[in-house]
A protein has these predicted regions:
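Bacterial N-terminal signal peptides that target proteins for export
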Residues: 1-8
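Sec-dependent N-terminal signal peptides
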Residues: 8-14
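C-terminal motif of bacterial Sec signal peptides marking the signal peptidase cleavage site
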Residues: 17-20
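Electrostatic cytochrome c docking/interface patches
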Residues: 25-62, 152, 158-163
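Mature, folded catalytic cores of secreted/periplasmic enzymes
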Residues: 48-50, 69-70, 80-85, 95-98, ...
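Sequence context surrounding c-type heme c attachment/ligation sites in exported
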Residues: 57-68, 101-105, 129-132, 154-156
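Extracytoplasmic electron-transfer domains, predominantly the class I c-type cytochrome c fold
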Residues: 84-143
Length: 163
């Protein structure tokens, strides 16, 4: 007995439907960095947004969980504790203070705490709390939001003299 055209057509449509419901093997893997960047309002001009790359966005996340209460004038929860501290800590975006410091100095003060570099003992050491990568992310964020903007030191020219 031969199947009729209607039966063949129904089987073909059923096969197409079943294959459409299966997993797609050619789907591109999700890119975890695709939406990882962020922005930060300029602390001196709220109409301006500073674009952050992935590393800087990770530093922002750390800043708002670990540093905001002493290194900003306000926090997501309200006023910060900054004005109650002596000496008053630098604002995280204060380029007039922080731009003059090297990345190594900032890494040391974050890792070892304020008293290790003759600053306030109120600044705790984060070397056991944050990874080295997280500390570098935090420094990258600091550099990104600095006002005036941070200018990396110029590298010296090559000492090689061509013939």
């Amino acid at each position: 007995m031969k199947p009729g055209r209607a039966t063949l057509l129904a089987l073909l449509m059923l096969a197409a439907l079943v294959s459409a419901c299966g997993k797609r093997g050619n789907a591109a893997p999700a890119d975890p960095l695709r939406n990882a960047f962020d922005t930060e309002p300029d602390w001196n001009d709220a109409t301006k947004l500073i674009q952050l790359n992935y590393q800087q966005a990770q530093g922002k996340r750390i800043f708002y969980t670990q540093c905001v209460y002493c290194h900003a004038d306000s926090t997501p929860a309200g006023p910060s504790n900054r004005s109650n501290l002596k000496p008053v800590p630098a604002l995280m975006n204060d380029g007039t203070v922080l731009n003059a410091e090297s990345d190594e100095y900032l890494q040391n003060i974050i890792t070892l705490g304020g008293s290790a570099v003759s600053k306030s003992a109120m600044m705790p050491p984060y070397g056991q709390t944050l990874t080295k990568e997280e500390i570098l992310d935090l420094i990258a964020y600091t550099r990104a939001i600095a006002q005036p903007p941070y200018q990396a030191p110029a590298r010296q020219g090559s000492q090689f003299i061509g013939r």
